[in-house]
């Protein structure tokens, strides 16, 4: 079962596409560009439509999704953590 999708190999986050992702659960992702699967252990409950980090991030790092810069990290994020407004901010303003 696919739990999250990743558009490009270089993306640092995947988008959760099922409900009920729980902390401690091994989740399976599909990298669309390469048609391959990856696995990550969720460190938090992650709602459908939200992002899961695919690598560790430090404040100031840039996050890529769909091959596009979606923002700057403002709080440390570990691989498998919920990546959202609490730890990523847009660079637009």
What spans do the regions from the language model cover?
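N-terminal small-residue-enriched
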Residues: 2-93
């Amino acid at each position: 079962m696919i739990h999250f999708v990743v558009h490009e190999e270089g993306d640092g986050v995947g988008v959760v596409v099922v409900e009920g992702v729980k902390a401690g659960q091994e989740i399976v992702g599909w990298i669309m560009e390469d048609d391959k699967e990856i696995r990550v252990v969720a460190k938090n409950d992650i709602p459908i439509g939200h992002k899961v980090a695919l690598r560790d991030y430090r404040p100031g790092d840039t996050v890529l999704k769909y091959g596009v810069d979606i923002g700057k990290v403002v709080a440390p994020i570990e691989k498998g953590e919920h990546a959202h407004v609490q730890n990523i901010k847009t660079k637009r303003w």
